[in-house]
């Protein structure tokens, strides 16, 4: 859930979210960081931070856990008055996120998605999802990487339908996770 919280917070502050796969090679991280020029990087943990450390030396880094080097944790951020950082002027045509492809044919390519584009995708899928969930409590088991463009959009549909969301630990643990979560819907 931390990823979703961070993603929505970035958008709410008027920023542009740039989710990246945790499985990228070092060169891909370097390329993406240089390409999108982030003003801030969120590293989920020390393992992920170590992968990007040498590429973010001059960029502020925050994390949900204390990192090995100087950083700001989310608990420190939550102590601040965040109301002044809310962007109340978001427009449908404004960039929401940049999703990078896997880079199978060269460097990863960034695709800019607007708030309106994501909303249109959600609106288009909502009727179908509501029909699938008719007379059921919505329980999603998310198993695609959250940096995947499809899963990135699905997270908003999950919120719109008031779903309980479970996150699969890994593809290898998908079946045991299904037994625990008892999802009423899974997407792929």
Language-model regions, residue ranges each:
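Conserved AMP-binding/adenylation subdomain of ANL enzymes
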Residues: 119-139, 146-188
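Conserved AMP-binding
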Residues: 1, 21, 140-148
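ANL superfamily adenylate-forming
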Residues: 47-92
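Conserved pre-ATP/AMP-binding loop-to-beta segment of ANL
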Residues: 79-100, 107, 133-139
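Conserved S/T- and glycine-rich ATP-binding loop of Class I adenylate-forming
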Residues: 10, 41, 95, 101-104, ...
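Adenylate-forming
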Residues: 43-50, 183-188
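Short beta-strand->loop structural element characteristic of the AMP-binding/adenylate-forming
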Residues: 3, 7, 11-40, 110-112, ...
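Conserved AMP-binding A3 loop
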Residues: 96-122
């Amino acid at each position: 859930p931390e990823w979703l919280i961070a993603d929505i917070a970035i958008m709410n502050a008027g920023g542009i979210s740039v989710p990246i796969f945790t499985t990228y090679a070092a060169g891909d991280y370097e390329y993406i960081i240089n390409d999108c020029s982030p003003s801030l990087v969120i590293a989920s943990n020390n393992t992920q931070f170590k992968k990007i450390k040498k590429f973010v030396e001059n960029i502020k880094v925050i994390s949900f856990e204390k990192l090995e080097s100087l950083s700001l944790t989310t608990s420190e951020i939550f102590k601040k008055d965040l109301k002044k950082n809310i962007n109340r002027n978001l427009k449908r045509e404004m960039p929401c996120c940049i999703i990078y492809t896997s880079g199978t044919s060269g460097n990863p390519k960034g695709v800019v998605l607007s708030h309106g584009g994501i909303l249109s995708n959600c609106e288009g899928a909502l009727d179908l999802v509501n029909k699938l969930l008719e007379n059921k409590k919505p329980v999603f088991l998310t198993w695609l990487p959250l940096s995947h463009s499809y899963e990135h959009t699905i997270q908003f549909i999950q919120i719109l339908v008031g779903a309980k969301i479970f996150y699969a630990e890994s593809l290898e643990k998908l079946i045991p996770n299904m037994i625990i979560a008892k999802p009423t819907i899974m997407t792929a």
